[in-house]
């Protein structure tokens, strides 16, 4: 049984809390793309956890977590994340955390280059809003075949040293000529690799073989995505995307079992919209700055990885319908419905108005999207606390109507509705 948990929008939809909830019925949770540039926040009886690299299933003692070959992994950040978790009583060992030998290493010079390039672009207003975690440069060097993989940390021999020398030589051309920086030291990079070789070699293995056997044995495997459909490198709002494929079709590939097919695709979407970074975000035009400030505070909309204030707006049915299509969703989870408890009327962006005066419900790209204006429908709010509700029929009628209206607009059934951050604060519809 292979299930994907993916984001419908720009990321920050609440995937971590849903993985934490649903993983109780799974044997394995695998991340298949991305790095430490976004965070999954989980709140349970042991406290609040922010996970950037490790799958959210790590909070379940009987679940094995896998970091797939489609990921880019900063060993330095991974060490800190493991330390943070173990300090809160989470047990982590090679028995419950397996790292793909094919995953790309985010090196210190990737992080440095990311910050330098964003600074250079900002001088002309051309920045992308990067998290400065080195993600794009890790993936870029992966495709240029000028970086190391986690498997290299297992065999730190003369061959790996020679490759590192070639990589650093090439990188120094960029660091010195473009950014005017001091050259990267091969010896320092080798010492850095040796440190993390000793730490992570026991965790590194052929996760594809492990997942293949598990699937054939009938184990239940969940694939956890980072970010959302609109950040996918191919299907997102280019160039304001991440540098990996966030769509569900890539899940078996990035995890390590490309010949296997998904059995279930669950999409996660918020009851409103949020976005971190640059690029068109049509829905934010449907609210005043004051209204957005109130929504941001009610939703605590600040990046889990960066702390940056998120851009916010009403639920965007145009973007969400496109996200559902990209993810091939069989069912949906609607998160943070309780955040809207304060609204007398709840706005929904149902279409975009284009510069020629026409309207569309299809998600456009390029300049058409840049210039689009939101078409807004308002529905009655419920103006009461719903955090204690656990059955759909016990929700206020206005809240029920809002959920069914979103189903109509995106064309997919909403099975799960979260009404609070706690693990059990969720309605499961029959």
Regions found by a protein language model. Name each.
Residues 1-430:
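Non-transmembrane, aqueous-exposed alpha-helical and coiled segments at domain scale
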